[in-house]
Each structure stands twice: as structure tokens, then as C-alpha cells.
Amino acid sequence: MPRAVNGTIHKNRRKKVLAKAKGFRGGRSKLFRTAKSAVMKAGQWAYRDRRKKKSEFRKLWITRINAAVRENGMSYSKFIHALKTHGINLDRKTLADLAYNHKEVFNAIVEKTKVAK
């Protein structure tokens, strides 16, 4: 009886790893051992950066809001406080979009918050 060497499973496992490493440079896309470690590392970076992306976007939104609010003679922190006291429930993502794409609407919101309550 011939010896079974698990050929198809072995080949499929390698093929799967090399498919994930497609587009990597040099041996990282051709050689199984280096491709395997490159795919593992890429997965770690992807996992880390999916979490990092959330804080990066929040920073971007705050920067955009701050720039737009300062054009109207107000600081970011005072603007956010005024929004809370006036009961305007808009999140930073929406405010940043308004500041970036719909300036006149954003300016109207800023003017509304400037009015004393």
C-alpha cells in the first residue's frame, strides 16, 4: 500500500497563504515561509489599524470643526460647550461634514450657539 502524504491539503494550504500574499514584493509573495510570516504581520497591522482608524477620523473631524469655528471667531471647546447647552445634538462627524461641504449651514449653527441662552 502506498504512503499517503496529504498532498492536496498541503497544496491548498500553501496556495491560500500565497494568494493572501499576492501583491507583496519579492520573496514575500513567492516563497511560502516568508509569505506566511508576511501575511501574519499584515493581519496584525490590519487588526491594529482598524481600531486606530476610529481615533484618526475623530481627530480629523475635530480639526475641521475647529478651523471652521475659528473663522467665526469662536474656539472649538466653547463651540462644543455651547452646542450642549443649547441642546443641539449633532455628532462631530456630522458637524465636520457640514463645515467641509455646507459652510452656510454650519455658519448658521455657529451663529445660533453664539446667542446667549
From Swiss-Prot:
The gene is rplT. Gene3D superfamilies: 6.10.160.10, Ribosomal protein L20. Pfam families: Ribosomal_L20. Binds directly to 23S ribosomal RNA and is necessary for the in vitro assembly process of the 50S ribosomal subunit. It is not involved in the protein synthesizing functions of that subunit. GO terms for biological process: ribosomal large subunit assembly; translation. GO terms for cellular component: ribonucleoprotein complex; ribosome. InterPro entries: Ribosomal_bL20, RIBOSOMAL_L20_CS, Ribosomal_protein_bL20_C. Belongs to the bacterial ribosomal protein bL20 family. The keyword NADP does not apply. This is Large ribosomal subunit protein bL20. Keywords: Ribonucleoprotein, Ribosomal protein, RNA-binding, rRNA-binding. One of its GO terms (molecular function) is structural constituent of ribosome. It comes from Leptospira biflexa serovar Patoc (strain Patoc 1 / ATCC 23582 / Paris). NCBIfam families: rplT_bact (TIGR01032). It comes from the Bacteria. CDD domains: Ribosomal_L20 (cd07026).
